Amino acid sequence: MPHTHSRHGSSGDDLCSTDEVKIFKDEGDREDEKISSENLLVEEKSSLIDLTESEEKGHKISRPDHSPVFNKLDTHAPSFNMGYLVSPYSYANGSPSGLPVTMANKIGLPPFFCHNADPLSTPPPAHCGIPPYQLDPKMGLTRPALYPFAGGQYPYPMLSSDMSQVASWHTPSVYSASSFRTPYPSSLPINTTLASDFPFRFSPSLLPSVHATSHHVINAHSAIVGVSSKQECGVQDPTTNNRYPRNLEAKHTSNAQSNESKETTNDKKKPHIKKPLNAFMLYMKEMRAKVVAECTLKESAAINQILGRRWHELSREEQSKYYEKARQERQLHMELYPGWSARDNYGYVSKKKKRKKDRSTTDSGGNNMKKCRARFGLDQQSQWCKPCRRKKKCIRYMEALNGNGPAEDGSCFDEHGSQLSDDDEDDYDDDKLGGSCGSADETNKIEDEDSESLNQSMPSPGCLSGLSSLQSPSTTMSLASPLNMNANSATNVIFPASSNALLIVGADQPTAQQRPTLVSTSGSSSGSTSSISTTPNTSSTVSPVTCMTGPCLGSSQERAMMLGNRFSHLGMGLSPPVVSTSTSKSEPFFKPHPTVCNNPIFALPSIGNCSLNISSMPNTSRNPIGANPRDINNPLSINQLTKRREYKNVELIEASESKTIVAHAATSIIQHVAVNGYHANHSLLNSNLGHLHHQLNNRTENPNRSEQTMLSVSNHSVNSSECHKESDSQAIVSSNPPNAGSSDNGVISVS
């Protein structure tokens, strides 16, 4: 590909014209490069002969008068009188320019002349009194550096004696800054050459320098023209010019290193001891040559197969010979190498030990950045952090990235950065699987979902059946929470009134060790159906809410208020009655109270053998579609949206006799037991009902008591009132007058 090179204008425009374009061509430099590398030895020998001849001629040549040519330089002098090297106008078509005829004949160049048409018959002297360069191997100059370029980059294979003489004339003072004082500004950068730079500056392409700075210094016309376009087109790294000696040095060093490595490997292979041959190997060694001679096969695998077949065809007597030989081989081997073991030939064990050592050393440093899977492996998942077990982000890795140490207190972080303790991580698992914060206590889950208690499996938050949020640790307190109970264990009995009015009757028990039982019944507007849920107030089945240690003032009113707040959204609808219990042992519906005389209203006798078991009752509640069945606080459950009913407003109930209300409540309980198929003694229930009526007649004889009995009906809340306690252990019925806005659901609070 032809390269065009435009001449650069210099400060002295009168020296030459600046409109000339030189075109150079690259011709087959790759092929000639191989030839030149083969001819290097011949060229080096001939160059030594030429150098000796040029030294002799250099001493004979006289110095002309214009020795101070660099200090008193004529402005029209071409190229600082360096035209003896190359004319600034070397034409591509071979037009005449100035070199001496003798020199041109020797190197095959057409004679050329300088600008003033004065042929340089005699070369200039060694400048500034410095003797000519002696290109001798003793000077430390490497001889291959005379030919740094490939043979294809210049058409002439080697320097003649005269051109070698030209190379010997120029000393480093040629390029000194003091030599170019007059015609060029001092700001022009000038390179001074060293002895190591000199050989490649005078290359066979006749370039004094390939560097751009000295390139401008030597010639005002942008370059002393060379044949290679690669030399013209940019600054070349000196390492490329010196590539022959440096490559040789690199080869020597690489060869030395390879030899050393081979020696070390040989040293390692020397102690390798082969294990003794067994019987079959001895047979193969003996018979292999015969099989190869008989068969034309050359593959060793096929030969081994043939030998194996023949070995199995041998009789025991023939094989025993080889077994005897193998035994002798082993004995000889043991005598030669007493401490030898076959494990020495296999480096797996040593490699394994090495890996373990490397791991132990890197554990202190780089292994902290690894995740638990990479650090401990799949076999030790117990040591993984909790997020790694869930295939989440490793907290140890994240803490190592953040510069913090690994969490040592056993706590970990979830995806959102909230810290989880070890106690909360199981709950965290359940919440991630679909549980909610409003669901029941998940630590004591019942495995059979059909036998789950009503506290855990109620689908609708708006259902009256079963008091759907008995154990929900939500903002509104549940009935079964210890916060809602007095310190003295009181039995709370909830009866449904005829129009969704709830009556809370509290009876003080003499012994605080008895477990309080909560019986909750709820019925529809007709009062025909109701559901019963007995929940023992134990620490394992109730929500972990802070328990009240002492009896508080107005505790019954607070219970009523919480109950009213809990069922403030009962206008949504009712689900089918569900009977559930959280206890499997038989407990009476109502505990017998021995102190009947101290009971303010009544004490219900126990109903015998009435244990309620969930397994005997059909689970009529269905799980809502698209919502978690345990999520009782979900306002968009299916039952709530599809079973919306309009309830009749409950008017204010003013009953002067509590006998009828309690009787209706007891009747509804018996009715509910009969409808749902409880195996209870109905005659016992009837007798208990008669006993209840008798007690009510005795209690309602006092007119003062009956006048003070009032029913408080509220829609969304029951106002708190003070709890009056008398010294004779008889509780006084306290109630508040109803609010003007109370309409829907009534709650009767009696303590």
UniProtKB/Swiss-Prot annotation:
<keyword id="KW-0678">Repressor</keyword>
<dbReference type="GO" id="GO:0009880">
    <property type="term" value="P:embryonic pattern specification"/>
</dbReference>
<feature type="compositionally biased region" description="Low complexity">
    <location>
        <begin position="516"/>
        <end position="545"/>
    </location>
</feature>
<keyword id="KW-0539">Nucleus</keyword>
<dbReference type="GO" id="GO:0010628">
    <property type="term" value="P:positive regulation of gene expression"/>
</dbReference>
<keyword id="KW-0804">Transcription</keyword>
<dbReference type="InterPro" id="IPR024940">
    <property type="entry name" value="TCF/LEF"/>
</dbReference>
<feature type="region of interest" description="Beta-catenin binding site">
    <location>
        <begin position="1"/>
        <end position="53"/>
    </location>
</feature>
<dbReference type="GO" id="GO:0000785">
    <property type="term" value="C:chromatin"/>
</dbReference>
<comment type="similarity">
    <text>Belongs to the TCF/LEF family.</text>
</comment>
<feature type="compositionally biased region" description="Polar residues">
    <location>
        <begin position="729"/>
        <end position="751"/>
    </location>
</feature>
<dbReference type="GO" id="GO:0001228">
    <property type="term" value="F:DNA-binding transcription activator activity, RNA polymerase II-specific"/>
</dbReference>
<dbReference type="GO" id="GO:0045892">
    <property type="term" value="P:negative regulation of DNA-templated transcription"/>
</dbReference>
<dbReference type="GO" id="GO:0007367">
    <property type="term" value="P:segment polarity determination"/>
</dbReference>
<keyword id="KW-0238">DNA-binding</keyword>
<dbReference type="GO" id="GO:0005667">
    <property type="term" value="C:transcription regulator complex"/>
</dbReference>
<dbReference type="GO" id="GO:0072091">
    <property type="term" value="P:regulation of stem cell proliferation"/>
</dbReference>
<feature type="compositionally biased region" description="Low complexity">
    <location>
        <begin position="457"/>
        <end position="474"/>
    </location>
</feature>
<dbReference type="GO" id="GO:0007435">
    <property type="term" value="P:salivary gland morphogenesis"/>
</dbReference>
<dbReference type="GO" id="GO:1990907">
    <property type="term" value="C:beta-catenin-TCF complex"/>
</dbReference>
<dbReference type="GO" id="GO:0140297">
    <property type="term" value="F:DNA-binding transcription factor binding"/>
</dbReference>
<feature type="short sequence motif" description="Nuclear localization signal">
    <location>
        <begin position="351"/>
        <end position="357"/>
    </location>
</feature>
<dbReference type="Pfam" id="PF00505">
    <property type="entry name" value="HMG_box"/>
</dbReference>
<protein>
    <recommendedName>
        <fullName>Protein pangolin, isoforms A/H/I/S</fullName>
    </recommendedName>
</protein>
<dbReference type="GO" id="GO:0001222">
    <property type="term" value="F:transcription corepressor binding"/>
</dbReference>
<feature type="compositionally biased region" description="Acidic residues">
    <location>
        <begin position="421"/>
        <end position="430"/>
    </location>
</feature>
<dbReference type="InterPro" id="IPR009071">
    <property type="entry name" value="HMG_box_dom"/>
</dbReference>
<dbReference type="GO" id="GO:0007507">
    <property type="term" value="P:heart development"/>
</dbReference>
<dbReference type="GO" id="GO:0045893">
    <property type="term" value="P:positive regulation of DNA-templated transcription"/>
</dbReference>
<keyword id="KW-0709">Segmentation polarity protein</keyword>
<keyword id="KW-0010">Activator</keyword>
<dbReference type="GO" id="GO:0019900">
    <property type="term" value="F:kinase binding"/>
</dbReference>
<dbReference type="GO" id="GO:0000978">
    <property type="term" value="F:RNA polymerase II cis-regulatory region sequence-specific DNA binding"/>
</dbReference>
<dbReference type="GO" id="GO:0006355">
    <property type="term" value="P:regulation of DNA-templated transcription"/>
</dbReference>
<feature type="region of interest" description="Disordered">
    <location>
        <begin position="46"/>
        <end position="70"/>
    </location>
</feature>
<keyword id="KW-0879">Wnt signaling pathway</keyword>
<dbReference type="GO" id="GO:0005654">
    <property type="term" value="C:nucleoplasm"/>
</dbReference>
<dbReference type="InterPro" id="IPR027397">
    <property type="entry name" value="Catenin-bd_sf"/>
</dbReference>
<feature type="region of interest" description="Disordered">
    <location>
        <begin position="514"/>
        <end position="545"/>
    </location>
</feature>
<feature type="compositionally biased region" description="Polar residues">
    <location>
        <begin position="699"/>
        <end position="721"/>
    </location>
</feature>
<dbReference type="GO" id="GO:0000981">
    <property type="term" value="F:DNA-binding transcription factor activity, RNA polymerase II-specific"/>
</dbReference>
<feature type="region of interest" description="Disordered">
    <location>
        <begin position="406"/>
        <end position="477"/>
    </location>
</feature>
